[in-house]
Amino acid sequence: MRRSTKLQRLLVFGLIGPIVGLNVWLLTQVYRYFEHLITLLAIAAILAFLLNYSVRFFERARMTRTQAVTVVLLATFTLLVILGVTLVPLLIEQATQLLERIPAWLEASRNNLQSLDSWAKARNLPLDLQGITGRISGQIESQLQTLAAQALSFALGTVSGLIDGTLVLVLAFYMLLYGDRLWNGLIQFLPPHIGIPLGISLRLNFQNFFISQLLLAVFMTAVLIPIFLVLKVPFALLFALVIGIAELIPFIGATLGIGLVTLLLLLQDVGLAAWVGVSATIMQQVRDNVLAPRMMGSFTGLNPIVILIALLVGLQVAGFLGVVVAVPIAGTIKGTLDAMYGTKQTAGVATEIVPRNL
């Protein structure tokens, strides 16, 4: 009997890994099949989360929910149209000019490094700047070819992009109207000690995270544009927007954005690149040490190692969108588990929390 019991335990533990791996693989295949639909739903859900604060503001002004949602979405659509007419053409023009100028920048930087390499060889210094430059230039040129191909496909897919944008707005409209009913219906299928903490944690993590990240990204973009204009940085608007969009990636986004812009400017002017890197880093420190703690606090409570793992998993599964939603999902899981253990230890906590948060 003891041997059979031990054998059963070994079989159970031995099958756990393959079963979990098979389930993960099946979920990955399902995601790949419905990737476009899931992406649209995720973007619409994020937009609904962000706009829900504005909807509540208009509801306090004695508007009905439908009227408030309609006003907010019309204002959002108007803002997007204004940005699309004024800002997007300028960004496309600057991006096109940047792609055209980078080969000339590469040639100029190659010539400068050749003279520096000759100076190092004349003094018997063990430097191979020319070889390093050749490898870096090859990598940049290959990436430029990829970007050019992606730009062409983006131009060809403009119509489908407009259709997707319309679908996102329509989905966000119905999510703002009926999302609570749908979510509460799904939560009811879960046991109360799981469903209630999950709903609270999801709402807190996603709303706090996305609103904070969006405001911090807007801050970086708005502050860096005049700084870059004063420094006479070429493509100031484009570079500031690149850093601002990179800010949406938690933990490492600012470093990636500033590093990319500084690297591109190094090809043209070392002094200008240094000024840009220093000024952007100072603004990043202001953001991280002054604004971010006030806006975000430590609501996720996640270890930095867990954040990095979540970012890598999100990147592998869903690309940029996965990176953006990885941290709030991880924070939701942790918050739910913490609340579940708390409700087990303290009776009646869930019934006290729900009316204040939902």
Model-derived features with residue positions:
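Anchoring transmembrane alpha helix of integral membrane proteins
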Residues: 1-89, 188, 207, 331, ...
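Hydrophobic alpha-helical transmembrane segments of membrane transport and translocation systems
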Residues: 273-358
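Juxtamembrane membrane-interface segments in integral membrane proteins
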Residues: 3, 54-61, 67, 74, ...
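Hydrophobic transmembrane alpha-helices
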Residues: 44-48, 172, 241-248, 252-255, ...
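Hydrophobic alpha-helical transmembrane segments
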Residues: 9-29, 38-42, 67-74, 100-120, 151-168, 214-218, ...
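Alpha-helical transmembrane segments and their immediate interhelical loop/hinge regions
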Residues: 154-266, 270-276
